[in-house]
Swiss-Prot record:
Species the sequence originates in: Crocosphaera subtropica (strain ATCC 51142 / BH68) (Cyanothece sp. (strain ATCC 51142))
Protein name per UniProt: ATP synthase subunit a 1
Localization: Cellular thylakoid membrane
Regions crossing the membrane: 20-40, 78-98, 112-132, 174-194, 195-215
Keywords from the named record: ATP synthesis, CF(0), Hydrogen ion transport, Ion transport, Membrane, Thylakoid, Transmembrane, Transmembrane helix, Transport
One cellular-component annotation, GO: plasma membrane-derived thylakoid membrane
Amino acid sequence: MDITPDSIIYWQWQWINLNATIVFSWLVMLILVLGSWLITRNLSIEPPLSRWQVALEIIVEQIRQQIRDASQQKADQFLPFIGTLFLFITMANLLTIFPVYQSPAGSLSTTAALALCVFVAVPIYGIKNVGITNYLRHYIQPTPVMLPFNLISEISRTVSLAIRLFGNIMSTSLLVAILISIVPLFFPAVMTLFGLLVGVIQAYVFTILAMVYIASGMNLQQRKTGNHHA
């Protein structure tokens, strides 16, 4: 039983290797790209709408609503980034119903890459909203002595994002595999559904936390104003 898809090597040449994490990450991206193209190529604003378009609109509206609730801001500016994160992680976990598939989210390299995307997105959105001077100034608030602590806080929450998703997906996969080997009859179907549920929940938690971090970087001006009033 492989703990992480990084340990499954399909091809190797010198220091270059093609492991399950890379292969299945490409597969997930291919499915999302092709699926998006197939669903959106015949979009219509006139009824009757296709079932695929109705399903797509429901998903997009739910993501938009969650973004609004988490950020208290207009959702459209965040929808491409947050929506992509959610759909990638969700699809990566849902495909575990296929026996040979290994979720890329079970690899620390994948979750670290996703967390790094969030780490980069936070200052981009923050600078866009409050300006580069105000954004950089918040690192030395309320005193310049706090600079190293604020930097550590930024890094630590990025690390926690990566480890949380990796740990939950990996531990769930191991638990399901162990229980299926012990009770090989009806139990596998139940545990597979449990694994899918956990995968969707973890995708939701990751993207909501990402949105909260981004929103916190954009609300610096409001916090500054609030401190002056206090």
